[in-house]
């Protein structure tokens, strides 16, 4: 693992803004409301030629025993243990508060190098607050504005003084396009876990990790950010994104929840396989179908996990009934894997991880040309394309354009005249023939150029 900095401090001093600035992406939610960050978040940061790991943490605040606030503090303490050095961030405009002083003592007791960061230092008020911080005894403050990108050269100097010299032999380029199929297969599978609020997404990931890495609570909406964690499951690497619960747009009122939903949608777009988690006590609802449709439109492989299976009375045929219901409501991903699980009890985890691996393999599938041609001839022979305006449509040949998801191009005489119903027939036929369950299959129509179109007709 690379050199690791944990960003700590009281709530709303700009820790997540600094995290986003150094990571170069908007990975952490940022809002003026204190306490937006709850789980600890990790990302790969870069500053000049320096590369490092960053851990963004919840604001250090006191909380009652067993409360969500106390568990947020435990997450912060874990981040400090994992870090090689700490960035203690305070709001220079606001000046030092009693909480800043208390948690400066906390940082000192960690017995790790500390970089004192005076954020929001722009303007006279910021300079005065930065000078005040010498009283903390943590050395010279690095004056920055995370929002405006000011002071980063001084922060670079502070990082450079703590970090070891880079190992030139260890430098690698994770360029997906340049990887062989074998190398690509060894990359971590990117998995997003989505669903309605309180479906048990974080509980499931905690069981995979064997620790309470993500905060859980009976209260819906505990998770706000999309949190990424690395999981080694039986020798296979996964990068799993826990996301905020997705509810109907009409029910999304608070600004923070709107930000959380947007964050979850970004996680779906970044993932390769998406696990849609249902609650076994409520099963399919309209919002679940909307989420599944979004996943299909984004071209991601889909697995359905029916969680809290330990809370329902079991009887033969339950999964079969769910399969029938899923195929009825989600024909665009017919045959999607459905796995019954209990995140709390650890039931069905092996089946779920196997389903994710299988779906990933299907999503990456390339069909041999000879087999593709055999399917194409058989599909047209079984159900010839219809006549439109008295003229028979001619489908010439098919080729696979790409995988991830499997996408094909059918060359034909009049692309705009092919009915949508016939295109659906081709998609379903291809999916069944090559066994591509639960992954989007794309077929695009393209007109074959007429080689005689440019020649002038001879006079009779």
Swiss-Prot record:
Binding site for GTP 2: 195-202, 242-246, 307-310
Functional summary from the UniProt entry: GTPase that plays an essential role in the late steps of ribosome biogenesis.
Organism: Rhodopseudomonas palustris (strain BisA53)
Protein family (similarity comment): Belongs to the TRAFAC class TrmE-Era-EngA-EngB-Septin-like GTPase superfamily. EngA (Der) GTPase family.
Residues reported to bind GTP 1: 9-16, 56-60, 119-122
Subunit structure: Associates with the 50S ribosomal subunit.
SUPFAM superfamilies the record matches: P-loop containing nucleoside triphosphate hydrolases
UniProt GO molecular function: GTP binding
Protein name according to UniProt: GTPase Der
């Amino acid at each position: 693992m690379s050199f690791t900095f944990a960003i700590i401090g009281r709530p709303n001093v700009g820790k997540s803004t600094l995290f986003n600035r150094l990571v170069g992406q908007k990975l952490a939610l940022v809002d003026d409301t204190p306490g937006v960050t709850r789980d600890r978040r990790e990302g790969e940061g870069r500053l000049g030629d320096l590369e490092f790991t960053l851990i963004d943490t919840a604001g250090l605040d006191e909380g009652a025993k067993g409360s969500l606030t106390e568990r947020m503090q435990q997450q912060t303490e874990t981040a400090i243990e994992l870090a090689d050095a700490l960035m203690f961030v305070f709001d220079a405009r606001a000046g030092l508060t009693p909480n800043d002083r208390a948690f400066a003592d906390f940082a000192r007791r960690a017995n790790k190098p500390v970089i004192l960061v005076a954020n929001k230092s722009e303007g006279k008020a910021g300079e005065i607050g930065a000078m005040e911080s010498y009283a903390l005894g943590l050395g010279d403050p690095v004056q920055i504005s995370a929002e405006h990108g000011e002071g980063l050269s001084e922060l670079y100097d502070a990082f450079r003084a703590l970090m070891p010299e880079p190992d030139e032999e260890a430098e690698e380029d994770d360029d997906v396009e340049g990887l062989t199929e074998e190398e690509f297969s060894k990359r971590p599978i990117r998995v997003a876990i989505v669903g309605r609020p309180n479906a048990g997404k974080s509980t499931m990931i905690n069981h995979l990790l064997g620790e309470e890495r993500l905060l859980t609570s009976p209260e819906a909406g505990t998770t706000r950010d999309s949190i990424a964690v690395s999981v080694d499951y039986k020798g296979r690497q996964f990068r799993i994104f826990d996301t905020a619960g997705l509810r109907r747009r009409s029910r999304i009122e608070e600004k923070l929840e709107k930000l959380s939903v947007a964050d979850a949608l970004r996680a779906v777009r970044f993932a390769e396989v998406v696990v849609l988690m249902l609650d076994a006590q409520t099963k399919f609802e309209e919002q679940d179908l909307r989420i599944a449709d979004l996943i299909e439109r984004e071209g991601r492989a889909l697995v359905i996990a029916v969680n809290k299976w330990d809370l329902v009375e079991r009887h033969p045929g339950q999964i079969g009934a769910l399969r029938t219901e899923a195929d009825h409501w989600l024909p665009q991903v017919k045959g999607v894997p459905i796995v019954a699980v209990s995140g709390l009890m650890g039931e069905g985890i092996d089946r779920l991880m196997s389903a994710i691996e299988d779906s990933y393999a299907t999503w990456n599938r390339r069909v041999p040309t000879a087999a593709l041609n055999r399917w194409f001839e058989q599909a047209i022979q079984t159900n010839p394309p219809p006549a439109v305006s008295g003229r028979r449509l001619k489908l010439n040949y098919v080729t696979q354009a790409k995988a991830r998801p499997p996408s094909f191009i059918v060359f034909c005489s009049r692309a705009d005249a092919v009915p949508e119903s016939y295109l659906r027939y081709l998609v379903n036929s291809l999916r069944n023939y090559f066994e591509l369950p639960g992954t989007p299959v794309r077929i695009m129509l393209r007109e074959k150029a007429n080689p005689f179109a440019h020649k002038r007709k001879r006079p009779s």
